[in-house]
Amino acid sequence: MLSLRNATEADLGEIRRIYEYAQDYMIRSGNPTQWGHFYPSADLIRSDLQKKVCKVIYDETGIHGVFALFDGAEPTYAHIEEGEWLNDEPYVTIHRLAGDGRVHGLFQCAAEHCKLLSPNVRVDTHANNTTMQRLIEKNGFKRCGIIHVMDGSPRIAYHWTAR
């Protein structure tokens, strides 16, 4: 059974290994531009750890997944094109979800945790990341439109609401 906890500095090696696996997987799967081999950077991972937003998903055999969970307004979500958010209520955001390829259910575990924290959860992904799109939609999120991340590149924006 999968569990979730706050990541610690002791997890840094496993977290980096998981992100490296995910980078390679995305490139092999036809999504070479979302992360490439450079995102997330070591500095960004350390920042997530320091801010206590980095979460790990694990079972009795070890850590299998990682993501960042943010509570509050996401600046890149302020403007959405080709649609609209389901509501303007406070929300949490899932960012940088990655897995090691050894277990299934990582997004479901992260989403269920977030749904307990907030009646509104948002997430975005690249148009070429069809694996993530399927997982997001399978977990009840609605496609709302297109947002642009800090570098200006577009992402498909999703929103789940309990209401």
Q: Which residues does each PLM region occupy?
A:
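A short helix-loop-beta-strand connector motif used in the catalytic cores of GNAT acetyltransferases and
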Residues: 43-56, 73-75
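Conserved acetyl-CoA-binding loop-helix of GNAT-fold acetyltransferases
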Residues: 99-116, 134-138
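Conserved GNAT-fold acetyl-CoA-binding loop/helix
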Residues: 23-43
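Conserved beta-strand in the GNAT
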Residues: 56, 62-72
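A short beta-loop-alpha structural element at the N-terminal edge
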Residues: 3-17
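Conserved acyl-donor/pantetheine-binding loop and adjacent beta-alpha core of acyl/acetyltransferases
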Residues: 68-102
